[in-house]
């Protein structure tokens, strides 16, 4: 499945399954002061982000793509972000994914 489709699945799951008290997300949130990196979904006030693996993480993704993603995630950690990553397979259990994100937000 394409990354855009997976992101749509996450957004729909969040809207339908997240508790009313949970804050809304910002999509494609640019988090780095100098690089053009963006998280798929972010809650900037508490520095929690979600990345949906797809596109470059598909089986054909090469070493350069993986290294670039590692650099992005390392820089996010340096800046104090907690990044949760989900695959298409994991999104097949939306209750578990959304529950985990809500838990991360509550602990932030």
Model-predicted segments: where are they?
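Nucleic-acid endo/exonuclease domains
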Residues: 1-108
């Amino acid at each position: 499945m394409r990354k855009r489709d997976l992101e749509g699945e996450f957004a729909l799951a969040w809207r339908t399954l997240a508790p009313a008290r949970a804050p809304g997300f910002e999509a494609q949130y640019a988090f780095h002061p100098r690089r053009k990196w963006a998280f798929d979904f972010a809650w900037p006030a508490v520095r929690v982000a979600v990345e949906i693996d797809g596109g470059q993480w598909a089986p054909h993704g090469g070493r350069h793509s993986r290294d670039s993603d590692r650099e992005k995630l390392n820089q996010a950690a340096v800046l104090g972000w907690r990044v949760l990553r989900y695959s298409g397979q994991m999104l097949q259990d939306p209750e578990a994914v959304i529950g985990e994100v809500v838990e991360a937000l509550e602990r932030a």
